Amino acid sequence: MKGHEPVVYDRASELGGKIRSAIPSSRLPKEVFDHELRRIMGKVTRVKLGEDGITEELFMDIRDRYEYTVIAVGAQNPRELKIKGHEKAVAALGFLRRAKVNDIAVGEKVVVIGAGNVGCDAATEAYRLGAGEVTLIDIQEPASFGKEREAAEASGAKFLWPVAAEAITRKGVVLSSGEVLGADTVIISIGDKPDLGFLPDTIDTADGYIKVDSRYRTADMKVYAIGDSVRPGLITDAIGAGRSVALSIDASFRGVDESYDRLPAIDTARIRLEYYDPGVREFQDIQVCSVACASCGGCRDCGMCETLCPQQAISRRPLQGEGYEYVVNDERCIGCGFCSGACPCGIWELKENDPIG
């Protein structure tokens, strides 16, 4: 959208990462994800899929070929729980991937070691696949929260803490107390870590993650890193980091230095509040609240600018997929400002032309 041409490399046959392959559809409906991906791909036309087995040589080739490189490889390697019989268990990430395509049987009883949000997703999916009893255990108070925790509890999952797993046998999970939790399937959900074996020595790491500054730049000024390759976090964290990096790269191309973390998303003076019903509303369900979002700074495709333009200088142009853009015919535009004055979200901005002569 800033006028640059990004190129995306991905080892999978389809874009989407864990959102497509592992996160349950109950968390993010497939139709919503597909719609958002089509919208994004309306802007990104250069995609190279099936780039499996990235090596340092390939990475350096990419790094040298383009002005900037953004590492967003996520965390795909499950952390190991080094207890006796751990090979009898399945990692949560692998379980969720197979569960999403209904390619795994769970049996009657399931024990999940690790009661974070991913563990809750695994528990909920286990119930969907036919489990009758699911128990999540943790050595400390579970870190799970929000919809994931609520969904697991609503499905019937039990939480036990603080308890520690000593071994995994054919009968189930042996606790440090000697108690055995019977299980047909044991799922280990203690986190994932990124595979950074392709990084050159010029990019610093710490504790298995890429070291970055406040703008997500690595020790190599041409390379940025975001998401779980930097630190464990939420999808929204990765999306926000991606936006910050995009703005930072654009600023570099323009030869300016801007601190986006301290700038508002849009000047509130540009928002036409007369279009909205004012009032303080109590917090409700997140989906209810999201419907009321005015999308300040983002086009809602209302078409008011195109309708009101007295010179018919504005037109809507479809892009690839479900994308679109509104364009101005410079030969028709008279600078009346109707578009800027009518836009509910503050998209249009009038700028003076350079003096002639």
Language model features with spans:
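Beta1-alpha1 glycine-rich phosphate/pyrophosphate-binding loop at the start
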Residues: M1-G53, R79, K84, A115-K158, ...
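Iron-sulfur cluster-binding cysteine motifs and their immediate structural context
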Residues: V7, R11-E14, L81-K82, F198, ...
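Mid-to-C-terminal Rossmann-like scaffold of FAD/NAD(P)H-dependent oxidoreductases
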Residues: E150, A154-S155, A164-A167, S244, ...
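Flanking helices and flexible, charged tails adjoining ferredoxin-like Fe-S electron-transfer domains
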Residues: E5, R20-G42, R46, F59, ...
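FAD-site-proximal beta/loop scaffold in flavoenzymes
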Residues: E87-E108, L181, T185-G240
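Short hydrophobic core segments
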Residues: Y9, Y66-G74, V112-I113, A183-G191
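A conserved FAD-binding loop/helix module that cradles the flavin
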Residues: A122, I226-S259
